[in-house]
Amino acid sequence: MTSWNVRPATSAEIDRIAQVWFDGWHEAHAHLVPPDLTRMRTLESFAERLHPMLPDVRVVGASGAPVGFCALKDDELYQMFVSHEARGSGAAAALMADAEARLSAAGVTTAWLACAIGNDRAARFYEKSGWRRTATMTYHAETPTGVLPLDVWRYEKPLRA
């Protein structure tokens, strides 16, 4: 396994991060969510969504060429994707450890994340990382036309403050 340095994302990396997100999202979710949502999840839409959340995004990979990212929103591990070529390298585990440390440092005692129902690869990774599936819930996915309710698995993990 590679030793990964997790670092803040830069605005110059938005296009590459958006590509990682687009590729990973479509591979993991396109067959699990309504076709309308899949059509709205364009490369441009991911880049647009990244701009306001950039202060909460951390990446792994060479400067200018990240191969994975993680974004937080309040007490939620909001997004995490690793490029196909970096899977199995420890990149996701490094991003997860960093996310958990940041959430804990922010005073979060129980973190949560949403996982698409049927995204078994992600579910196995979360469970291996100590997260526990606690419920099926309705998640409000942001889209260009408003919010789309989706049933998802909710995972939680207690953190040390």
State the predicted function of each range.
Residues A47-V59, E76:
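A short helix-loop-beta-strand connector motif used in the catalytic cores of GNAT acetyltransferases and
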Residues T109-A123, K128-R132, T136-A161:
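C-terminal "cap" of GNAT-fold acetyltransferases
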Residues F22-E48:
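Conserved GNAT-fold acetyl-CoA-binding loop/helix
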Residues D56-G68:
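Conserved beta-hairpin
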Residues M1-D15, W153, K157-A161:
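Conserved N-terminal entry element of GNAT/NAT acetyltransferase domains
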Residues K73-E85, A93, A114:
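Conserved acetyl-CoA binding element of GNAT-fold acetyltransferases
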Residues G88-A101, R124, K128:
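Conserved acetyl-CoA-binding loop-helix of GNAT-fold acetyltransferases
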